[in-house]
Amino acid sequence: SRGLGDVYKRQVVKRMGAFPENFVVAVKDEQIVGFINGGTTDKPVLPDEFYHDITLHRKDGEIQTVFGLNVIPEYRHQGIAGELVEYFKELAKERGKKALILTCKEHMIPFYESHGMKKLGVADSCHGGATWYDMQIWF
């Protein structure tokens, strides 16, 4: 049977095809141990449909989004996720983007705040029945 992991893998492959320039991996011990990715838009917050409809990605959009940040369990708590966020922020700045935006669950807010992002409040997202928060940083 197909698990949530299979659905997620298909989404990641779609994203890699739609915006390969916005897909960054972390490599350690000669293996991929994490990644960060996201499309670009002109919207200041991230609507749910952006996750599911890759055609909403605008390569020339002024705002960089984060769709996914993941580090495999055995490499977590080693600073890899933070390095990916910082690298992605710098990449967005270098490309002339005006901001970086994302949605996250409550327990991740302190992590993103430690990387300069501001919490805007509860997001409109209802993905997975969870409560999500809009986060952003303007450059």
Q: Which residue ranges define each predicted feature?
A:
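Short loop/turn motifs at secondary-structure junctions and domain boundaries
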Residues: 14-20
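C-terminal "cap" of GNAT-fold acetyltransferases
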Residues: 105-106, 121-139
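Short, small-residue-biased leader/transition segments that mark boundaries at the very start
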Residues: 3-8
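Conserved GNAT acetyl-CoA-binding A-motif
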Residues: 85, 91-105
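Conserved G/P- and acidic residue-centered "switch" motifs that form tight phosphate/ATP-binding loops
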Residues: 79
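Conserved acetyl-CoA-binding loop of GNAT-fold acetyltransferases
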Residues: 113-123
